[in-house]
Amino acid sequence: MNFRGNRMINNDPLFDLLNKEQQRQQHSLELIASENFASPAVLAAQGSVLTNKYAEGYYQHRYYGGCKFIDEVEMLAITRAQQLFGARYVNVQPHSGSQANQAVYLALLKPGDKILGMSLQCGGHLTHGSPVNQSGKWFNAFHYGVDAHSGLIDMDEVETIAKRERPRLIIAGGSAYPRHYDFARFRRIADAVGAMLLVDMAHFAGLVAGGCFPSPLAYADVITATTHKTLRGPRGGMILTNDARLAKKIDSAIFPGLQGGPLMHVIAAKAVALGEALQPEFKRYAGQVIENAQAMCQQLAQRGLTLLTGGTDCHLGIIDLRPQGLTGAQVEYFLELAGITVNKNTLLGDPQPPSITSGIRIGSAACATRGMKADDFTLIADWISEIIFAIKTPNIADICADIRQKVTKLTTNYPLPYQ
């Protein structure tokens, strides 16, 4: 990234910070499951002249003039999403996955309605009815969890709670669950109690697009997704459905219900990312993401670490650190010293607060974008294991420094996609 040739930019410390962040990304292993690297084309679209344009409303129904090309940009993003996921109706205006979920709630629910989602401790998301989130404050939220032994979603519990509480909306999907979802059974349960089914595929949308993860489209009334994470696009959200009636309600919930002007530069970047995901090489990428995650989880288990559910079907894994007597905050800190970025994550029955936790979440999407393969992830798993088992020893600093050098050497072989 070169910022030369502009006097104001050269004198602005902001751009020095951007360069430093680029160096951090280049020479670190990004294992945060919700992060990825956007292509130069995505970055260019997001930094384009569309930043300058207001466009409240929808295709051919804008509240501002000068939207001829804006309409075409948004329609391009919509048609690409329709083609990619097979959905009849797509709204690409949500600023984030959280606002996509909020729009669904606004469209389908009334304050005080019952909703049923996955517990945050078991891998759910804040927007699925957490008491600290708007979804938990405005609605009467109930939560299902995972089996304490297998770590898998307890579908019998889902059914029991649904039959007892008869929620208006059931939510499938989460932010820290490493296995497939039984969308068919979620659908049967929803039908049995007269509920609608929302699938939040923010994390695995790219894997669905690549044909490597089951699609919820045949089962869900409505689907929300993010366009970054495994889709490798800009930070943003979208909503998909095959129901024309719901689509109309959702459009009204986004605008004018929640948002004003859409971020057209971001929608353009979404169109780029969706176009990239339609290419044959994206299927290969999605498959590599899963292969890498499975190789990493398998090696971590062989080294004696405890993986939630014993492994993964997707791009992420969850390590339970309680057997080592460590916290997620500790492990996150020491891994970052070695140039490996992860995030602490709460677990079922976690005695630690969310700022500390007893687990960490790891993901393969970002490093797969750089071209890393299963052998690289096996090596990365060895480094993670070595650090975890050394944290309580006096030579942890030396071990982190040694692995930091190895990380730098490995990342040098895999340039960032925007370089």
UniProtKB/Swiss-Prot annotation:
One of its GO terms (biological process) is tetrahydrofolate interconversion. Homodimer. Pathway: One-carbon metabolism; tetrahydrofolate interconversion; Amino-acid biosynthesis; glycine biosynthesis; glycine from L-serine: step 1/1. Belongs to the SHMT family. Its EC number is 2.1.2.1. It catalyses: (6R)-5,10-methylene-5,6,7,8-tetrahydrofolate + glycine + H2O = (6S)-5,6,7,8-tetrahydrofolate + L-serine. CDD domains: SHMT. Its cofactor is pyridoxal 5'-phosphate. One of its GO terms (molecular function) is glycine hydroxymethyltransferase activity. Pfam families: SHMT. The record marks H228 as: Plays an important role in substrate specificity. The keyword Cytoplasm applies. The keyword Transcription does not apply. Keywords: Amino-acid biosynthesis, Cytoplasm, One-carbon metabolism, Pyridoxal phosphate, Transferase. Catalyzes the reversible interconversion of serine and glycine with tetrahydrofolate (THF) serving as the one-carbon carrier. This reaction serves as the major source of one-carbon groups required for the biosynthesis of purines, thymidylate, methionine, and other important biomolecules. Also exhibits THF-independent aldolase activity toward beta-hydroxyamino acids, producing glycine and aldehydes, via a retro-aldol mechanism. One of its GO terms (cellular component) is cytosol. The gene is glyA2. (6S)-5,6,7,8-tetrahydrofolate binds at L120, G124, H125, L126. It comes from the Bacteria. It comes from Salmonella typhi. This is Serine hydroxymethyltransferase 2.
